[in-house]
Swiss-Prot record:
Pfam families in the cross-refs: Beta-lactamase
Entry's transmembrane regions: 6-26, 389-409, 433-453, 471-491
Protein name (Swiss-Prot/TrEMBL): Protein flp
Record's keyword terms, sorted: Cell membrane, Membrane, Transmembrane, Transmembrane helix
Miscellaneous note of the record: Has two of three conserved motifs typically found in penicillin-binding proteins (PBPs) and beta-lactamases, but no penicillin-binding activity has been detected.
Length: 498
């Protein structure tokens, strides 16, 4: 067989095998609607991989689907020094995920007729006023909910707020008369102060403290009996220790905080308690169904916000994927809650470190749930053929060694003048064709996770693939390009006649 025929035969086989695998898995992705044991193992690998990459000391993770808990588990440590492991009962500061409780409380008070969303804030917060271009502007409750009040995101910086202004009433008075960034109702600008003001409105309307009203009206009825609000940096038995990274090492962190930020940032809860909250959000009782649906409705467009189309009542929304979600970040904690009411599942990640890997982990878990049929099929097929993949690894390693020996021998021949380089238009054309085919094969390999699994990339897939498959993939890739190098050497060299 000529080199040219061998070349095209090799490439054709590789492409056909790749396409066949993709078609087979796509057509045979018929599995149970529940997450399988393989999926559970995949999820554990994904979580452990992302926590390790983010140097996150501890996290608790909850997945609810179709009203059932598929995962409620702790990973790592809630207290590294004392070696206390994280668990579903570990309490974390959930930061901005507090806002959804505040938003729902406001909507309930409006439903009861105790306030109107179009009310001027000053109706419920006497003497409150803020300016735009030097003129007093009216801000409505709805604009606070939608984050379109014009209140600057940095209005409560340390320069403006001191320890003396540590109560919600005090800090609100401290910002009165300040300048807005834009006219109310015109632009989205995320600011904790919007929800702090909503917390103050709740206090003034109900004649109860914000924390007492939320506890009695929502936490107790939902059986979130271990959820509370931060009052001090002292820790109880189930409270996670917060950490900040110094280099790649987590160190204990106890930053100062202000009680006035409670309605927007300082609920403390666990995945055990949030299980009730997620089930309530996905399948609310009839008397709350319209209220929950209203809390998920878009109030403002969020141009420039990643993965979000709009802001609702304490939630970001993505209409394209039917997602309702919110992240939460403090100096030493982070959280992320994602809901998909259409497909009836929710994901919660709570961590004792402020890390970009928390939203990444949620994204990976969301992909796992959405594609779990394909993933389960892939895992099942691959696990059945581990021994065969080991054989592939041995064969590919042998091929790599042979290619290396041949290339080294060819180089030795060239050095001793035993072979000559070929130069012709035909060789040049074949060389360019080889390069193009290499690129095409590389693109096919790069796209395999999408072709087979529907989304994501190799870095995600490799977090849960068995080691046998990883080795087979790596050696096959190296063998492929080693073979192409050998073919190029055949094309470009010839043995001299003696």
């Amino acid at each position: 067989m000529t080199t040219k025929k061998l070349y095209f035969l090799s490439i054709s086989i590789i492409i056909l095998v790749a396409i066949s695998i993709a078609i087979y898995i796509t057509l045979n992705s018929n599995t149970k609607t529940r997450l399988t044991n393989d999926s559970q193992q995949q999820i554990d690998k994904i979580i452990e991989h992302d926590l390790q990459k983010g140097h996150i000391p501890g996290a608790s993770i909850l997945i609810v689907k179709n009203g059932k808990v598929f995962l409620n588990k702790g990973y790592g440590y809630q207290d590294v020094d004392k070696k206390v492991k994280a668990s579903p009962t570990t309490k974390y500061e959930i930061a901005s995920n507090t806002k959804a409780f505040t938003g729902l409380a406001i909507l309930k008070l409006a439903q009861e007729g105790r306030l109107n969303l179009n009310d001027d804030v000053s109706k419920h917060v006497p003497h409150f006023k803020m300016n735009y271009n030097g003129q007093n502007e009216t801000i409505t409750i709805k604009q606070l909910l939608a984050q379109t009040s014009g209140i600057p995101s940095d209005i409560t910086s340390e320069d403006a707020v001191t320890n003396k202004n540590n109560r919600l009433n005090d800090v609100t008075r401290a910002i009165m008369g300040d300048e807005l960034h834009h006219k109310p109702g015109e632009e989205f600008e995320y600011s904790n102060m919007n929800y702090d003001l909503l917390g103050l409105i709740i206090q003034n309307v109900t004649k109860q403290s914000y924390t007492k009203y939320i506890t009695n009206s929502w936490l107790k009825p939902l059986h979130m009996t271990h959820t509370s609000f931060k009052q001090t940096n002292n820790k109880s038995k189930h409270d996670a220790i917060g950490y900040e990274l110094q280099g790649s090492t987590p160190v204990v962190s106890k930053p100062e905080f202000n009680l006035w930020d409670t309605p927007s940032a300082y609920m403390m809860t666990s995945t055990e308690d949030l299980e009730h909250w997620i089930k309530f959000q996905l399948n609310p009782p009839d008397k709350y169904k319209s209220l929950v649906q209203q809390s998920h409705k878009n109030l403002s467009s969020t141009i420039g916000e990643p993965n979000a189309n709009a802001y609702a009542s304490g939630w970001f929304t993505n209409n394209d994927e039917h997602l309702v979600f919110h992240s939460g970040t403090l100096d030493n904690f982070s959280s992320f809650i994602l809901l998909n009411p259409k497909q009836n599942y929710g994901i919660v990640v709570l961590a004792n470190l402020n890390s970009e890997y928390v939203p990444k982990l949620v994204e990976h878990l969301n992909t796992q749930i959405v594609n779990h049929k394909r993933y389960s099929t892939v895992a099942s097929i691959l696990n059945q053929y581990k021994d065969q993949f080991n054989i592939v690894t041995v064969l590919m390693t042998t091929l790599i060694l042979l290619a290396f020996i041949f290339s080294a021998y060819r180089a030795w021949q060239m050095r001793h003048g035993q072979i000559l380089l070929r130069r012709s238009k035909r060789i040049a054309v074949l060389s360019w064709l080889t390069l193009c085919l290499c690129i095409a094969i590389a693109l096919i390999l790069y796209a395999l996770p999408y072709l087979i699994l529907g989304s994501n990339n190799w870095s995600f897939v490799l977090t849960w693939l068995p080691i046998e498959i990883k080795l087979a993939l790596i050696t096959t890739l190296i063998a492929l390009f080693s073979t192409l190098i050998v073919i190029l050497l055949f094309l470009h060299t010839k043995i001299t006649k003696t």
